[in-house]
Amino acid sequence: MSQTMSKNNREAKEKKGQPEPLSGSHKVKNRNHSRQKHHAHHDM
């Protein structure tokens, strides 16, 4: 599922070329969320 989303995002970015900051922001947010969840679990 993640691979498909990444491919779609990449295609959209290459096609539009403008939604670069949007894609970056989304990626960072997603990564941050995953990291935070992991950290919380570790903390527990």
UniProtKB/Swiss-Prot annotation:
Family: Belongs to the SspP family.
Principal place of residence: other
Ranges of biased composition (kind: Basic residues): 26-44
Organism of origin: Bacillus cereus (strain ATCC 10987 / NRS 248)
Biased composition, class Basic and acidic residues, residue ranges: 8-18
Recorded coiled-coil stretches: none
InterPro entries hit by this protein: SASP_SspP
Location of region: Disordered: 1-44
Lineage top rank: taxon: Bacteria
Biological process (GO), any one: sporulation resulting in formation of a cellular spore
Localisation per UniProt entry: Spore core
Induction: Expressed only in the forespore compartment of sporulating cells.
Pfam families given in the database record: SspP (PF08179)
Protein name: Small, acid-soluble spore protein P
Gene name linked to the record: sspP
Keywords: Sporulation
